[in-house]
Amino acid sequence: MTKSELTAKMQENAAYLPGKTVKLDFGGEGTILMDGKNETVTEDAGEADTTIKISWEDWQAMAAGQLDGMTAFMTGKLKVEGDMSNAMQLQGVLSKLR
């Protein structure tokens, strides 16, 4: 799945946290902004309440259920900046994509 396909699937499935903004930062692969305030998912690099830094490959593994979010965090594959509670709620968002 490409980042554009993922963005479209996330928008279609309302894969965002209501009232919150979370940015997925894939480094050189770009970003996805889940804007629960405006109920949109875009490839914008705007400001967010929480920024999740993870490689595109590791994100794909998490989305497929092959990599646990807590394991990714504990091993340094996933880094969180900002409101940690939003990051903790992302499992629910991921379940909308399976």
What are these regions (language model features)?
Residues 1-98:
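Feature captures hydrophobic
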